Amino acid sequence: MAVDRSIIGRKSPSFTVTVEAGKIKEFAAAVGEASELCWDEDRPGGIVAPPTFSHIFRSGKMELMLSDCGLDATKFLHGEHEMVYHRPLRPGDRISYHIEVADVQEKAGRRSGTMDIVTFETVLRDAVGEKVQTIRQTFVARR
């Protein structure tokens, strides 16, 4: 059954998180990040989060968004992931975001048959509304 294109533009509720230095260091340790940018609080500008740190904000929320759109998360595979960094995340940043369905496409593969491709976009903004990161994530499901 085809994914209903009317879900394009559907948004999750808004979420707000505050970036913490301890969480940056925990994440950096977990992913093996050795850069002093993530560890040296005394360096000019202080520490910054590793590039993929924002994934912890969205943990579990993407599955909820798929479900809210009537999509079975167990049928979808991760297809593509793009992150645009407008500036680094720093301790104390208050970040607001929501997840939005950006696009729904249908593609026919020679061997795989018809597939639905759903793209979500998340824009992380700081307390004054400036973009910090833009994340586009694409999921693929065979019919």
Please place each PLM-identified region on the residue numbering.
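Hot-dog-fold acyl-thioester-processing enzymes
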Residues: 1-80
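HotDog/MaoC-like acyl-thioester-processing domains
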Residues: 1-3, 85-143
